Structures are given as structure tokens and as C-alpha cells.
């Protein structure tokens, strides 16, 4: 876990060079997070009473449902543990994938009992991800791996890419009385207009030419 976002710890392999306490933009965004209630979708990740036993909950959310975890951009050792678990899964080595998942959970959740194939929980009903990177419906094991990943990398810039590589689900959020929809095509960003105008044959990515401003 990240205790001091500005000081490299033992499991910080790479840190963004702009991540320092003198960066006004970083401090502004870190302050703004506290004015945005944490989504129920994220809270639902902590199943079966784990909101009181999982250290990530207390580190991420306060009693007012505000995000209190410092924004972070970098690579931690936990990232490789999740890569290991998911790689084992996609190679068909489910026992090894489950073992990797249990090893990480044991470091995060007080008194946790290891999952077995029989005790794996259902995926949270509110979760946006329902298919894997191959478009196949999630199994309980993969859903558990992705659920733990969601908890682990909250406010670390990971979620967008998780959604993108696992089906690119469409969803909407409300803000100031308006509904904002994240459409599937938006997982691929638009090409800047200046590049299209100055590069012969350059075509805008699908979806953006139909937008009305």
C-alpha cells in the first residue's frame, strides 16, 4: 500500500516524475477528490463485511464516503501480483490463479479465509465489467481477481484501462442535473483536429465525426 506518495517505498518500482508536493495541479486534484462522493459501485467491492477488515477500505474512504487516499501514478509490486493471477487464469491454470489471489488478499484483509473454487463469491451486481478481454462472460474466479484489482488501484489511474480491456461497457453519471454517457467508442480517444488537417489521409477515430457541439 502507499503510505507516503512522494517517497519511494520498497514496492514502488516506477514513480511519475511530476508526482511531488510542490506540484500545484496535483495538490488541487487531490483536494477536489474529497468533494466527490465515492461511488456505491466501488463500496460494493468490499463484500461480506470486508469494509471493516480490509485495510484498503479505511485507507481509501472516510465515514462521509469521501475519497481520502492520495492520488498516485506509478507501478507497485501489487500490479505484478495481479498480472500473475490473471495470466495464470487465461492460461487455464485456475489453481495457480486462485493461489496468487489468496496470497494478495492475505496481505490486505485481517483474518481472511482463503477462497476455494466453491467459496468464490458472485461478482457485485453493480459492477460494470461483465465480460473478459475475449468477450466471454466473467467466471467467479476472474470476477474475484478484477474485484480485488478495483479495490487495490482506487485513485491510481487504473480503472479506465480495466474497463477498456474488459468489454468497454457503456454507462452514465449525473452531474449538475445533467446525464453524461460514456459510450463504447470513447475508450479510444479522438485524434486532435490539427493532426487530421496537417496529415494527408488521416481519418478521425470512429464515433467522433458524428458528434454535435
Whereabouts are the PLM-identified features?
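Aromatic (Trp/Tyr) and acidic
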Residues: 32
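Acidic/polar-rich alpha-helix caps and helix-coil junctions
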Residues: 1-24, 44-213
